Amino acid sequence: MECPKCQGNMEEVTYGRNMTVDRCSNCKGIWFDVGEAEVLKGKWMSEFVDSGDPEMGKEFNKIVDVDCPRCGKKMDKIADPKQSHIWYEACQEHGMYFDAGEFTDYKYETLLDKFRDLITGKRS
């Protein structure tokens, strides 16, 4: 599979015995098949799959038109409802893509995230 952001090679990374995600060997973005990100979010030490540089991830997050690596359709850019500063790409049929550093941020909702929501309010 090819990375939807930098067209690098996606390599399989295994968490535990039965969960495999795809991580780009170049930009370290991560592809999660449908449901995998939500499952891994609750697992101990699952952030190890997110080994990329968050600063590099911020640069790749600026890319707007991103195609699903499974079907080639344009993915939606979605803000996490609990942490509105996190934007990821999602294909309703196949999964979601996080830039380097985003999954770790997605996993850990901090006090600062809750404060941001109070200040900025919820998106409609």
Give the positions of each predicted feature.
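Secreted/processed peptides and extracellular or luminal domains of membrane proteins
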Residues: N9-E12, I30-D33, K74-K77, Y97
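Short metal-binding segments enriched for Cys and/or His
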Residues: G29-S46, G95-L111
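Non-ligating segments of multi-cofactor redox enzymes
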Residues: K5, N9, M96, E102, ...
